[in-house]
Swiss-Prot record:
Keywords: Cytoplasm, Nucleus. Its main location: cytoplasm. Required for the quantitative accumulation of H/ACA ribonucleoproteins (RNPs), including telomerase, probably through the stabilization of DKC1, from the time of its synthesis until its association with NOP10, NHP2, and NAF1 at the nascent H/ACA RNA. It comes from the Eukaryota. This is Protein SHQ1 homolog. It is found in: Cytoplasm, Cytosol; Nucleus, Nucleoplasm. The gene is SHQ1. Residues 438-492, 550-579 are annotated as: Disordered. Residues 459-482 have a biased composition (Acidic residues). It comes from Bos taurus. Belongs to the SHQ1 family. Gene3D superfamilies: 2.60.40.790. Residues 568-579 have a biased composition (Basic and acidic residues).
Length: 579
């Protein structure tokens, strides 16, 4: 038999059941309903529902069939007109559980309708979120269970004993079946400290344009929350919250595929289930916000990496430590690492919880789909998400509201994360101020030096111009005495420049004396007489003449140096006696 696609809706007097059976034989179908039971059969489809309210057969029931769409629509009158049926969109919970064909089990769950008034604690009572404390007692090693438990409600164990190699990429903990909860937490904290990168954090902190864009994004629950606050200013009724959240056909198909079952959880395990739900929702809200609702290949990694419940099998004792752990992991692992993003995700999770279990279920279905399409993250569906999708449909709305209030009262600061964020930010601001101060000083200095440098440039240009003018005048004076002497001087100038070396000597008074060594064969090494060269420097000049490769070069403008050499050579040529 096939379970058909179905949908339930209601008005004050009727419950409407729409059943899609495209391949059914329309001429043969049966409908049965009485009290909270509803059954439909049209070969090869069979549907059995346990309704949240009672219906009655009084002659006002109606039925129709749309041949084009293949949909049966059945309207059933309510036993109590005006009564609101809760949880009509929780399709898995509506599917009646399978009855055992064996003997009656030794442990049996008692339904709420069968509970005596004084025997069992009322599930609607206010939930106490404070963990019960007991005196510390030393536990002997022989009493410890080596098979540490994990999964939904800590009901699973032994899963990783044979699949450690295949599933090592899913979780961060090694040998979870032999690692206690305390050891898991110790290793997790050490891994987070080793992974924290101050440079990455400061880069996102100082240059937060991308983070601002992520913070401005409005996910699907933001509009629903605004609508809820507008329409439910006075009271928050379950029927109004359920009407805000709708499920797609794909999500309804997911719900029909889940196996309806019950969970026997003690008080401690029950609390762990709620706490882990917060942790998983925080990771999901972060992923939805940073990707702006567009899933990618990193979505599964982000969710399981940011949730210690999923990657470290962490257990919790209060809401605050969940926030601290989530904040640390956001600043250590994903692409965007900013504390404002942590707080924004925290507020998103509160909104989802306040929207009710329909919104929570929608988030869990999305996580289930992401993990199902990722290898090997699908194992986390078997350990956690599938059970959460079934369990949340039967969870009490009052407890979710109480959980939202407990989360809303919690607070988180940077100092509580234990990563020295405030010290890093203070150091970054100090460096930024120093850089700004140094840049301002360099800018003011350059502005002061600009006029002086321009004046120096103009002064050097004037000196070069005067030097060239003096050289021209000296050349004109030397050309006046006679053509023979000038020709002799110029004939010696060519080889003299090519094969001579100039040594500039400074005397005590700072005067620059020049001695020129003639490069001809007859007079090699003999200094030409210079009018201003003192006689005491004769031996020194002779020694310098023998070592031509040693010279002191003083950089000066080419024009002035050339003019100086020409003037010296011409003066010496005039002093040389004619043959």
């Amino acid at each position: 038999m096939l379970t058909p696609a179905f949908d339930l809706s209601q008005d004050p007097d009727f419950l409407t059941v729409a059943i899609r059976v495209p391949y059914a034989r329309v001429s043969e179908f049966d409908v049965y309903f009485e009290g909270v039971d509803f059954k439909f059969y049209a070969k090869p489809y069979f549907l059995r529902l346990t309704l949240p309210g009672r219906i009655v057969e009084n002659g006002n029931e109606q039925g129709s069939y749309d041949a084009d769409k293949g949909i049966f629509t059945i309207r059933l009158p309510k036993e109590t007109p005006g009564q609101h049926f809760e949880g009509l969109n929780m399709l898995t919970a509506l599917l009646a559980p399978r009855k055992s064909r064996t003997a009656k089990p030794l442990v049996e769950e008692i339904g709420a309708s069968e509970v005596s008034e004084g025997g069992v604690e009322d599930d609607d009572d206010e939930f106490d979120w404070e963990i019960e404390q007991s005196p510390y007692e030393e536990v002997p090693e022989s009493a410890l269970n080596p098979n540490c438990r994990y999964g939904f409600g800590n009901l699973r164990s032994g899963v990783f004993q044979r699949l450690q190699d295949e599933l090592s990429d899913v979780i961060d903990i090694k040998d979870p079946d032999f690692t206690s909860a305390a050891e898991r937490r110790q290793k997790r904290l050490a891994a987070e400290l080793a992974k924290f990168d101050p440079d990455h954090y400061l880069a996102d902190f100082m240059e937060d344009e991308a983070v601002k864009q992520v913070l401005e994004y409005n996910p699907w629950w933001s509009d629903l929350y605004s609508e809820m606050m507008t329409s439910l200013g006075k009271s928050q009724e379950e029927e109004n919250l359920a009407a805000l959240v709708s499920f797609s056909e794909e999500e309804k198909y997911q719900l029909r595929k889940f196996v309806n079952k019950s969970y026997l959880l003690d008080k401690k395990a029950h609390r762990q289930v709620y706490y882990s739900l917060i942790d998983i929702l925080l990771a999901y809200c972060y992923e939805t916000r940073v990707t702006e609702g567009e899933r990618n290949v990193e979505s599964a990694w982000n969710i399981r990496k940011l949730s210690p419940t999923l990657c470290w099998f962490e257990t919790w004792t209060n809401v605050h430590e969940i926030l601290v752990s989530f904040g640390r992991r956001v600043l250590c692992y994903p692409l965007y690492r900013h504390f404002k993003l942590v707080m924004k995700t925290y507020r998103d999770t509160i909104k989802i919880l306040q929207l009710g279990k329909s919104a929570v279920l929608k988030c869990l279905l999305d996580i289930h789909k992401i993990f199902q399409e990722n290898d090997p993250a699908y194992i986390l569906n078997d350990l956690y998400i599938s059970d959460y999708c079934v369990w949340i449909q039967k969870a009490k709305s009052k407890k979710l509201a109480a959980l939202a209030e407990a989360l809303k009262k919690a607070s988180l600061t940077k100092a509580q994360l234990g990563l020295e964020l405030e010290e890093l930010e203070a150091a970054a601001f100090l460096v930024q101020e120093e850089e700004a101060t140094s840049k301002a000083g360099v800018h003011s200095t350059s502005r002061q030096q600009t006029p002086s440098s321009s004046s120096e440039t103009s002064g050097s240009e004037e000196s070069e111009g005067s030097a060239s003018l003096e050289t021209e005048e000296s050349d004109s004076e030397q050309e006046e005495p006679g053509g023979g002497e000038s020709e002799t001087g110029h004939s010696l100038l060519g080889p003299f420049v090519e094969e001579s070396s100039m040594a500039l000597l400074l005397n005590d008074g700072g005067m620059c004396r020049s001695t020129t060594f003639l490069g001809s064969d007859g007079g090699r090494g003999q200094p030409l007489a210079s009018p201003g060269a003192p006689i005491a420097f004769g031996p020194l000049i002779q020694e310098l003449g023998e070592q031509l490769e040693t010279s002191v070069q003083i950089s000066e403008p080419k024009d002035s140096a050339a003019g100086q050499q020409d003037s010296v050579l011409e003066r010496e040529s005039r002093q040389t006696p004619e043959d």
